[in-house]
Curated annotation (Swiss-Prot):
Pfam families: LexA_DNA_bind, Peptidase_S24. This is LexA repressor. The active site is at S152 (for autocatalytic cleavage activity), K190 (for autocatalytic cleavage activity). Gene3D superfamilies: Umud Fragment, subunit A (2.10.109.10), Winged helix-like DNA-binding domain superfamily/Winged helix DNA-binding domain (1.10.10.10).
Length: 231
């Protein structure tokens, strides 16, 4: 049987994963549970791992995976039609095996170059290359890939050199990580926050400031659904 805080954290992580495709940062979990420090989150995650409810994948972006939920939480779990995917082991070997067994197991996405997870860069207009990924990594819809440049999203598990898989779209919910086009010139990867008639682009690194714009100056170009990291 889980404690109240363990139950709250597990349900929060599950809902965040299903809504955004990414596990929440420790700061987000701390705020969601109204705890004073991140050490409490570490203890709760450790307890959930020991009891077989949660798995933490070391050295991987967005490294939390919900293995199961308590029966009461599972019954109330909304059917969003989206389930996050985690790449395990050697990516290249698995993908080659998948292609040999089933050509439909891999899809090709346009790679539009580097996007700033630091200071915004000039908007990317033409794709420079292509990337092949497991089809199971993404859900329905049109997708593209961007290489992350910079460290402003490190607390969200997004590192310099990661490949971000983006679901193309012009809308996103507040709190989701999006590709934002500013003034039709700059493009950046940040967490979106709606603030009345303004839009805030929020980094996940205390070294960077939140940027706030009139809503009409920011256009959503898609939202983050997965990350791919090479070792």
């Amino acid at each position: 049987m889980l404690t109240r805080k363990q139950h709250e954290l597990l349900v929060y992580i599950d809902q965040h994963l299903r809504r955004t495709g990414c596990s929440p940062s420790f700061e987000e979990m701390k705020e969601a549970l109204d705890l004073k420090s991140k050490s409490g989150i570490h203890r709760l995650i450790g307890a959930l791992e020991e009891r077989g409810f949660l798995r933490r994948h070391k050295h991987r972006a967005r490294a939390l995976e919900v293995l199961r939920l308590p029966s009461d939480a599972a019954a109330d779990r909304p059917d969003t039609g989206f389930a996050p995917n985690v790449i395990r082991g050697d990516f290249t070997a698995r993908l080659q095996g998948a292609r040999a067994a089933d050509p439909a197991a891999a899809i090709t996405l346009p790679l539009y170059g580097r996007i700033a997870a630091g200071q915004p860069i000039e908007a990317l207009r033409e794709h420079q290359a292509e990337i092949e990924i497991p089809a199971s990594l993404v859900g329905p819809g049109e997708h593209y890939a961007l290489e992350v440049a910079g460290d402003s999203m490190v607390d969200a598990g997004i590192l310099d050199g990661d490949t971000a898989i983006i679901r193309r779209g012009e809308t996103a919910e507040t709190g989701q990580i999006v590709v934002a086009l500013i003034d039709d010139v700059e493009v950046t990867l940040k967490r979106l926050r709606r603030r009345g008639n303004s839009t805030a682009l929020e980094p996940a690194n205390p070294r960077y400031e939140i940027r706030i714009f009139p809503a009409e100056r920011v256009k959503v170009q898609g939202r983050l659904v997965a990350l791919f990291r090479r070792y």
